[in-house]
Amino acid sequence: MDVEVKKNKNEPYLKDHEVKDLIKRSQQGDQIARDTIVQKNMRLVWSVVQRFINRGYEPDDLFQIGCIGLLKSVDKFDLSYDVKFSTYAVPMIIGEIQRFIRDDGTVKVSRSLKEMSNKIRKAKDELSKLLGRVPTVAEVAEHLDLTPEEVVLAQEANRAPSSIHETVYENDGDPITLLDQIADHTEAKWFDKIALKEAIEELDEREKLIVYLRYYKDQTQSEVAARLGISQVQVSRLEKKILKQMKLHMNDT
């Protein structure tokens, strides 16, 4: 396990409202908030990776891809949803890994991240000697002509994850472990419940298209709005209505 992850092991875990506050700041361009979200959710990414361990891929490679899914979920999360971030993020991370496996041979993200991580490590050493202190993410990014996001992603992707039995979140004193998040408690897989396939079948064609574009094609609300010829606000309202309808359907099953 990475030294920094060990160091963070005994730190209190973020509650859902704290995560959402960080997401809000991140979506407004706060890089520190974005870095914190990634740091605090590394265990969540690793828990998802466990589902794909025996498919012939290196766990570290899948972890790197999962980090990309995590960052996408931060960017796309709608704070108006009455849903925990972890509930939204896990399917996004799973989807990113599944796409990587499906497109293997054409997408070489893991290799490029490893190469980038090596460059970043060397750059940090050089800048530390030059500045007499540890350089910031922005300084490393500027030195290598990268974006701050690329630097953070490469650094986090190379950090070793921790146990899936550790608590990820505590909601009103109720601890939630990684295993709780992804375990198959019934014959139906956890992700199938998140996808709500049966509930989707109850939607009309436009609603199905919105779900498909948002959650299977990773399109933003603005992109969906352009596709449907309506406003982003309308898409947001429709999406909330759809999610509520699907949730009710699941509760009745």
Curated annotation (Swiss-Prot):
<keyword id="KW-0731">Sigma factor</keyword>
<keyword id="KW-0804">Transcription</keyword>
<protein>
    <recommendedName>
        <fullName>RNA polymerase sigma-F factor</fullName>
    </recommendedName>
</protein>
<keyword id="KW-0805">Transcription regulation</keyword>
<dbReference type="InterPro" id="IPR013324">
    <property type="entry name" value="RNA_pol_sigma_r3/r4-like"/>
</dbReference>
<comment type="function">
    <text>Sigma factors are initiation factors that promote the attachment of RNA polymerase to specific initiation sites and are then released. This sigma factor is responsible for the expression of sporulation specific genes. It is responsible for directing gene expression in the forespore compartment of developing cells of Bacillus.</text>
</comment>
<feature type="DNA-binding region" description="H-T-H motif">
    <location>
        <begin position="221"/>
        <end position="240"/>
    </location>
</feature>
<dbReference type="InterPro" id="IPR013325">
    <property type="entry name" value="RNA_pol_sigma_r2"/>
</dbReference>
<dbReference type="InterPro" id="IPR000943">
    <property type="entry name" value="RNA_pol_sigma70"/>
</dbReference>
<keyword id="KW-0749">Sporulation</keyword>
<comment type="similarity">
    <text>Belongs to the sigma-70 factor family.</text>
</comment>
<dbReference type="Pfam" id="PF04545">
    <property type="entry name" value="Sigma70_r4"/>
</dbReference>
<feature type="short sequence motif" description="Polymerase core binding">
    <location>
        <begin position="61"/>
        <end position="74"/>
    </location>
</feature>
<dbReference type="InterPro" id="IPR007624">
    <property type="entry name" value="RNA_pol_sigma70_r3"/>
</dbReference>
<dbReference type="InterPro" id="IPR007630">
    <property type="entry name" value="RNA_pol_sigma70_r4"/>
</dbReference>
<dbReference type="InterPro" id="IPR036388">
    <property type="entry name" value="WH-like_DNA-bd_sf"/>
</dbReference>
<dbReference type="GO" id="GO:0016987">
    <property type="term" value="F:sigma factor activity"/>
</dbReference>
<dbReference type="GO" id="GO:0030435">
    <property type="term" value="P:sporulation resulting in formation of a cellular spore"/>
</dbReference>
<dbReference type="InterPro" id="IPR001387">
    <property type="entry name" value="Cro/C1-type_HTH"/>
</dbReference>
<dbReference type="InterPro" id="IPR014236">
    <property type="entry name" value="RNA_pol_sigma-F"/>
</dbReference>
<keyword id="KW-0238">DNA-binding</keyword>
<dbReference type="Pfam" id="PF04542">
    <property type="entry name" value="Sigma70_r2"/>
</dbReference>
<dbReference type="GO" id="GO:0003677">
    <property type="term" value="F:DNA binding"/>
</dbReference>
<dbReference type="InterPro" id="IPR050239">
    <property type="entry name" value="Sigma-70_RNA_pol_init_factors"/>
</dbReference>
<dbReference type="GO" id="GO:0006352">
    <property type="term" value="P:DNA-templated transcription initiation"/>
</dbReference>
<dbReference type="Pfam" id="PF04539">
    <property type="entry name" value="Sigma70_r3"/>
</dbReference>
<dbReference type="InterPro" id="IPR014284">
    <property type="entry name" value="RNA_pol_sigma-70_dom"/>
</dbReference>
<dbReference type="InterPro" id="IPR007627">
    <property type="entry name" value="RNA_pol_sigma70_r2"/>
</dbReference>
<dbReference type="InterPro" id="IPR014322">
    <property type="entry name" value="RNA_pol_sigma-B/F/G"/>
</dbReference>
